[in-house]
Amino acid sequence: MSYNGSYHQNHHSTLQVKSKFDSEWRRFSIPMHSASGVSYDGFRSLVEKLHHLESVQFTLCYNSTGGDLLPITNDDNLRKSFESARPLLRLLIQRRGESWEEKYGYGTDSDKRWKGISSLMAQKPPKRSYSISNPEDFRQVSAIIDVDIVPEAHRRVRLCKHGQERPLGFYIRDGTSVRVTERGVVKVSGIFISRLVDGGLAESTGLLGVNDEVLEVNGIEVLGKTLDQVTDMMVANAHNLIITVKPANQRNTLSRGPSQQGTPNASEMSAATAAATGGIQRPMKMNGSSDGSYHPKQHDANDSDSGED
């Protein structure tokens, strides 16, 4: 757009924008009566179309009245950029990751100018600059859920796998567990975590441990299922795996409030069952554990082990 007589007549009714991407410049105008209703998404789409950036990840910045280069990331700071257009909104478009301000922080240019020569005479070493980028692409990778539903001795964990960048990172095996029933304590087959892979998702979250017993996979109880069936269930739900486990180390389970302290534990239920049936109460061997939790014995080398999930 050229600055001629018609511009001087109409510049009060339009917002003039001058955008720059690499060595490419564009000039366009936005009617002032509609500028207040322009959304960030609509403005970004307009810039994207003018500079043909459909396949380019880019950031938008503008020169404020104080001389700082500030980002445009939402409707609020887009409106601020319109207010600072005196008389022209200077827009800088950069590829994502190439911006100096994106790496070291926005709004630091005016601070350097006002310090002047005093910054050169400072005796103290400069503070370390931290790289704080725009908040985006945050993804949940793990969480403990249903704390108010799951029994105190159990833990329900959600593992979220994004793409193929990192495996779930744990192996499972079959073994023998115990259950407290009306007939007393009985041995049943169970599924246990046998190994955690270094750098895997399960190891990095710290929510799963070796010898933890797997009770449910995405709401489906694993009791009575084979090792291959449980493995297939985990692989099918790998991108949003919800696994309920009984941790081998009960010291790391979440403690409940005072209202939950009256709930009998497994040993008390076992004692009550033995007394009711007239049996003899004997201490149950816990594989060397002193905290009352059940740690399944390690199997031999010929134990079956699922592939890495």
UniProtKB/Swiss-Prot annotation:
The keyword Cytoplasm applies. Keywords: Cell adhesion, Cell cycle, Cell division, Cell junction, Cell membrane, Cytoplasm, Developmental protein, Differentiation, Fertilization, Gastrulation, Gonadal differentiation, Membrane, Tight junction. It is found in: Cytoplasm; Cell membrane; Cell junction, Tight junction. GO terms for molecular function: protein kinase C binding; small GTPase binding. Signal peptide: none annotated. Pfam families: PB1, PDZ. Residues 249-309 are annotated as: Disordered. Disruption phenotype: RNAi-mediated knockdown results in a diffuse distribution of early, recycling and late endosomes and Golgi bodies and reduced intensities of markers for these organelles. Residues 14-96 form the PB1 domain. Gene3D superfamilies: 2.30.42.10, Phosphatidylinositol 3-kinase Catalytic Subunit, Chain A, domain 1. One of its GO terms (cellular component) is P granule. The keyword Coiled coil does not apply. PROSITE patterns: PB1, PDZ. Residues 156-249 form the PDZ domain. Residues 132-149 form the Pseudo-CRIB domain. InterPro entries: PAR6_homolog, PB1-like, PB1_dom, PB1_Par6, PDZ, PDZ_sf. GO terms for biological process: cell adhesion; cell differentiation; cell division; centrosome cycle; establishment of mitotic spindle localization; establishment or maintenance of cell polarity; gastrulation; gonad development. PANTHER family: LD29223P, PAR-6-RELATED. Belongs to the PAR6 family. Necessary for apicobasal and anterior-posterior asymmetries associated with cell adhesion and gastrulation during the first few cell cycles of embryogenesis. Required for localizing/ maintaining par-3 at the cell periphery. Regulates mes-1 expression and/or localization pattern during early embryogenesis. Acts together with par-3 and pkc-3 in maintaining epithelial cell polarity in the distal spermatheca. Plays a role in endosome and Golgi body positioning. Interacts with par-3, required for its peripheral localization, and with cdc-42, required for the activation of a par-3/par-6/pkc-3 complex. This is Partitioning defective protein 6. The lineage of its organism: Eukaryota, Metazoa, Ecdysozoa, Nematoda, Chromadorea.
